[in-house]
Amino acid sequence: MTQYDYIIIGAGSAGCVVANRLTEDAETTVLLLEAGNPANKPEIQTPLDWTKLWCTEVDWAYFTEEEPYINNRKIYCPRGKVLGGSSSINAMIYIRGNRRDFDQWQELGNPGWSYQDVLPYFKKSENQQRGASQFHGVGGALSVTDPIAPAVTSQRFVEAAVAMGYSNNPDFNGEQQEGAGLYQLTIKDGKRHSTAAAFLLPILNRPNLTTTTEALVTRLLFEGTRTVGVEYMHEGKTHQVFVNQEVILSAGAFDSPKLLMLSGIGSPEHLQALGIPVVVDLPGVGQNLQDHLASPVAHQATQDLQPAVTSNIAEAGLFLHTESNLDAAPDIQLFFGPVLWAPPAYARPGSGFASTPCLNHPESRGSVSLRSASPNDSPVIRLNYLQSESDVQKLVAGIKIIRQLFNSNAFDEFRGEEVAPGADVTSDEALQAYVREVCDTVYHPVGTCKMGTDPMAVVDPELRVYGVDGLRVVDASIMPNITTGNTNAPTIMIGEKAADLIKAVARVPQQASVISS
């Protein structure tokens, strides 16, 4: 019988961190299971090529169901199926979130998750190019750097925002988040620095770490309500492995709830309808899905704006309030890039520039459920984008602000025709229709195994799944509410904090008995 102290399911943004930290103790054995491949696809390394990874072998390439509030469109949701998970296919933007996000998590009944509590974990993982400070760390595994060769239009975007009265903010992860600046990136020596590159590849030779790729976990194994192991498929065969300590589920906001439900943890009605025996009645599994969404404003350019090979495309940004409540976190984040990023129906050949208003705290909530009892079927994803009218209105407000920026003097020498939404789309009604027609994901799904103490919570503040022993969820799915900005950095922080929580309660090993299939 094969046994490890810990089994980690998913070598993604959090899973790689947990694997690194738990194996720092040479006596602790860890099995890391990843459904995807090693991260050796060359486009992973090249920052500019991240969109070329979509719908390839390193992408789960999920689609939502038809979304009723956005003209029944199905939204394509790329997710990393590779060592490093989505940190190997994302746009590499390092945004931690707003301090209010984490203070709110604590206020929702999650002690230990306030901004002051989590800041040390952000700093621990970081090797900040600018050096150490009150807010930043050096010597950590993850390289955080300034853009190497930002486009002149990205600089102009910041200048235009400052001229409009927004503050110049060189550090969105520092004293304040509001304002305009260039994004810092998880790049090292001009190449993507995923969590696989930062936390996993340097330690692959640790004798107490076993990493298995192309391993699809099919279910968790229980004795009563104690988690004793996992079952997975590898090279066409079914394997069972067992744990002395804990199973750590780090499969992401779509696949962590999917695996819990396949294993009998979730809404009894849903599980019984699919013939899955119920282990724990936990109705919150797969609920509370939140994501950032955006609708672009795109211009043709009057001159060639080819971004550098080290560009992540979304080079500059602006965090702002469309409402008067300045005590709240910014409700809109703008991304700017020196490319003609337009919806397919609006796309034009040639050079351009674009900006998207991203809704930081959508009111709409979605869900993840099972399509069948087969682990090979993709989950049923319903985002419910723009169910709330206020979400539409905020995106329209964001489009209007971008138009002001693009019509400023800073863009005079570059401004060509507006191709999306188009210069004739001016009324609020027309802009609202445009938003419903084109709004798209910013690839930040979270919240489907939320942390908390209310009846819909899935994990407690130490990330332990309610109703069973020896099982934690450690990834973006535990966020009670989505953070303000890109979600990769807070997911890495969750991995760092979880590793300490796990180490603090390591217990005397118990012998697990074999479960027959």
Where are these regions (language model features)?
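N-terminal redox-cofactor-binding region of secreted/periplasmic oxidoreductases
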Residues: 1-517
